[in-house]
From Swiss-Prot:
<protein>
    <recommendedName>
        <fullName>Tol-Pal system protein TolB</fullName>
    </recommendedName>
</protein>
<dbReference type="InterPro" id="IPR011659">
    <property type="entry name" value="PD40"/>
</dbReference>
<comment type="function">
    <text>Part of the Tol-Pal system, which plays a role in outer membrane invagination during cell division and is important for maintaining outer membrane integrity. TolB occupies a key intermediary position in the Tol-Pal system because it communicates directly with both membrane-embedded components, Pal in the outer membrane and TolA in the inner membrane.</text>
</comment>
<dbReference type="InterPro" id="IPR011042">
    <property type="entry name" value="6-blade_b-propeller_TolB-like"/>
</dbReference>
<keyword id="KW-0574">Periplasm</keyword>
<keyword id="KW-0132">Cell division</keyword>
<dbReference type="Pfam" id="PF07676">
    <property type="entry name" value="PD40"/>
</dbReference>
<keyword id="KW-0732">Signal</keyword>
<dbReference type="GO" id="GO:0042597">
    <property type="term" value="C:periplasmic space"/>
</dbReference>
<dbReference type="GO" id="GO:0051301">
    <property type="term" value="P:cell division"/>
</dbReference>
<comment type="similarity">
    <text>Belongs to the TolB family.</text>
</comment>
<keyword id="KW-0131">Cell cycle</keyword>
<dbReference type="Pfam" id="PF04052">
    <property type="entry name" value="TolB_N"/>
</dbReference>
<dbReference type="InterPro" id="IPR007195">
    <property type="entry name" value="TolB_N"/>
</dbReference>
<dbReference type="InterPro" id="IPR014167">
    <property type="entry name" value="Tol-Pal_TolB"/>
</dbReference>
<dbReference type="GO" id="GO:0017038">
    <property type="term" value="P:protein import"/>
</dbReference>
<feature type="signal peptide">
    <location>
        <begin position="1"/>
        <end position="21"/>
    </location>
</feature>
Length: 430
């Protein structure tokens, strides 16, 4: 695990400039109806104060998923420091059937040992359901906490946790030589660092499926251009810089292709590049505007936005040819879809009754659920496990990032401290 921790973040931290003006989650709608769980402050064994509140990070992760409602620390019936000290009856009396305990120990070499145990207090009282231990340096303590959260989440839900993922987003600052910045942070806004800064707009970041690259749009040459940047060394590869519009990049799940929109022939149309050969082929062709591609898991089909019926709606097309099929019918218009990793659902920007919100559509049954309640919501991006969505919305004269669980129960805001934040993109598993 120690090696995995180093590999996952080492390549990012080699060159990136860490920023101090970070975004932070502010809860706007809680999860009182979610499954209650106990998360006890982790025992600290070392000099002075604990370097991180690991237990607090685990509790926040579980709350952010929308599936759990951690008991407030002031209401904990006991504060056990190990699985053996957990008294199941004290917790089950509060309706809690699982408790997380843990320990953080300072090692002589300056590293830390982070251990956790998930204890059953319901069905099989006192049974340890999951446990783990990680040896990490100080800078990876939050990552170790997220690793514990992932394990607990998966054990209790059967769904792989996505708390060790990251988000990319664009920040527009007021003034300065380089007011546009592409940044990456942990999913919860911590450990933010700079990927690229520019005097001209940056747009539409998109992750490669292995998390090693970001595609995005830049206007630094005087017109739009699509580029792919390798995070480990900052190397930039230009993909497209045709006359007029070059935008909306999306890597295929198998990593072999990049879809994007070009208007070099007049109307916006979809194209796909084979990243190995560099060959580009046109997917859609017509007078309508076709843009915002999102891949289905087979790497052969795309969801995309088209105005061929008059107003923007989401369609599906095979990249090898065929007639696009419309897949959204509710509301006045739907656009900017993001298809889940299993291909069963998608999130999108849906407009109805003068409101523009983030909605989720079941691609098998067709049902639509509005998830957000903020203002002028746009650019939704799903977590790789499909349980959370990050998106941008308008607030005052600027824009901020928001988080909502895909069941709509948990909502939070990630306010920036030094500029407008937009165009979020959730990373794959790292």
């Amino acid at each position: 695990m120690k090696q995995a921790l180093r590999v996952a973040f080492g390549f990012l931290m080699l060159w990136a400039a860490v920023l101090h003006a970070e975004v932070r989650i502010e809860i706007t709608q809680g999860v009182d109806s979610a499954r209650p769980i106990g998360v006890v402050p982790f025992q600290w064994a070392g000099q002075g104060a604990a370097p991180e509140d690991v237990g607090g990070i685990v509790a926040a992760d579980l709350r952010n998923s929308g599936k759990f409602n951690p008991l407030d620390r002031s209401r904990l019936p006991q504060q056990p420091t190990s699985a053996q000290e957990v008294q199941p009856a004290a917790w089950s009396a509060l309706g809690i059937d699982a408790v997380v305990v843990g320990q953080v120990t300072s090692n002589p070499d300056g590293s830390y040992q982070v251990a956790y145990q998930l204890v059953d207090t319901g069905g099989a009282p006192g049974t340890t359901l999951a446990q783990g231990s990680f040896k990490v340096t100080k800078q990876y303590l939050r990552y170790a906490a997220h690793a514990a959260s992932d394990a607990v989440f998966e054990k209790l839900t059967g769904i792989k946790g996505a708390f060790r993922t990251r988000i990319a987003y664009v920040v527009q600052k007021n003034g300065g030589q380089f007011p546009y910045e592409l940044r990456v942070s942990d999913y919860d806004g911590y450990n933010q660092f700079l990927v690229h800064r520019s005097s001209q707009p940056l747009m539409s970041p998109a992750w490669s499926p292995d998390g090693s690259k970001l595609a995005y749009v830049t206007f630094e040459s005087g017109r739009s251009a699509l580029v792919v940047q390798t995070l480990a060394n900052g190397a930039v590869r230009q993909i497209a810089s045709f006359p007029q519009h070059n935008g909306a990049p999306a890597f295929s799940p198998d990593g072999s292709k990049l879809a994007f929109a070009l208007s070099k022939t007049g109307s916006l149309n979809l194209y796909v590049m084979d990243l190995g050969s560099g060959q580009i082929r046109q997917v859609t062709n017509g007078r309508s505007n076709n843009t915002e591609p999102s891949w289905f898991p087979d790497s052969q089909n795309l969801a995309f936005t088209s105005d061929q019926a008059g107003r923007p709606q989401v369609y599906k097309v095979n990249i090898n040819g065929g007639t696009p099929q419309r897949i959204t019918w509710e509301g006045s218009q739907n656009q900017d879809a993001d298809v889940s990793a299993d291909g069963k659902t998608m999130v999108m920007v849906s407009s109805a009754g003068g409101q523009q919100h983030i909605a989720k559509q079941d691609l098998e049954a067709g049902g639509v659920q509005v998830l957000s309640s903020t203002f002028l919501d746009e650019t939704p991006s799903l977590a790789p496990n499909g349980t959370m969505v990050i998106y941008s919305s308008s607030q005052g004269m600027g824009s901020v990032l928001n988080l909502v669980s895909t069941d709509g129960r948990f909502k939070a805001r990630l306010p920036a401290t030094d500029g407008q934040v937009k165009s979020p993109a959730w990373s794959p598993y790292l």
